[in-house]
Amino acid sequence: MSNEAKVEMVPMLQDMRTYITNHYWSEILCEVEEQLPGFKAQMPSCTQGTRLFLHHEESKIVKADFWRRSRTKMSADLYVRLKIGASKNGELPRYFVENMYLSTDFVLDGTIQWLPESTVLLDECPEREDWTKLSKYLVPIFSYDDMELQVQNMLKTYLGETAVTAYQPRAAWKLTKAMELQISSAPLFKNRRTEAILFFQEGIARAERQVGDETVMEEMVIPAKTILLNSNAKSFQRADGDGREIFHECIHYEWHTMFFTLQALHSADLRLLEYGEADRASRPAAKDVRWVERQASYGSTAAALPRPVLMPMVHQYWAEVVNQSINPGDKIAHVIYQIAQEKQVSKGLIRTRLIWLGSPAAKGAFNYVNGRYIANFAFDRESVSSGDTFVISRTQFLDLYEQKEDFRELIDKKLYVYADGHVCLNT
């Protein structure tokens, strides 16, 4: 076995500040030069009666903040160091440095377009209190509460107010149509994990085709603005499909079009990113890529069952069992089962939504382990963190037993036993 340390590989992303510097900085400075005379009053007295101009090579961006204006439009607030020249009557120019702010807008929708007329030179940082901030890679910075509200706003914008006040069957398909996206399907070649891919622009998908007894790969041209469903994925076969894989791609379209455009990707397929060896500078890129998928996963689940639709039903069915002498796991299971029956949605979707909305007791209900649902159970909320579980499959138990010596010692001493999806204290 090799003793060489594993090399960590991370995505190599292009950031917006670097893109502006490399592609638009000189043009932006030309716009700024035209606005300099309006700031003479706050500049050195030697500038009076002179012509002002910028030394482009020695003017630079010190700090950049990016703000989301819409699905495809953003504002860049740049704190800049400007080397300004002042010349008069053909004399040699005198140079001085001013630190100032400027704001300018871009549209990113397959291509990147700068809007020169939006450029404004400022003497102080503009207020952006109610705007959504973007990371340097143009990923929206949302808290989980923000995502809940953003999902509701998206549904209301495209489908109307009723989309967040009453359950909408096939809402994912309706949203796709309202966004002017189309849906297609194909069996992706040797790929059972990817559920769907959004193509922002025309692209190529590698699909399977049967030739006699052999499965071969063929390339398919996928039109722009198409969600391609993978017919090899398990979600494609589910009878109780809630459209989460479609919502997932709609979230990418609504929240991440600018991110994917900046990375010059024609589809929302993060596997197409280039990777390199990790270093300190590349860590934020890896974090942002994780957030792109986390936002789409959270948003798709929230869209499938919006909070204003779910919570009244939860309160209704909880009231039926709140005073019964059964464990909280059984009470939550009753709520989940009744909503699933009423709206014909999966119990897993409801369970996940309850956990994410602050009801960790739902972890004790409808756990599918070893090919069946195990008994509902209750637990001390303080004894498990948000990312942990009390449930383990037989295969996972055996893997731990083989790989973890301290765990193996506890089991061999018969202090704990495996029973019904749990590792239990042997009483």
Identify what each model region corresponds to.
Residues 1-427:
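Active-site hotspot residues in diverse enzymes, especially metal/ion-binding acidic/histidine motifs
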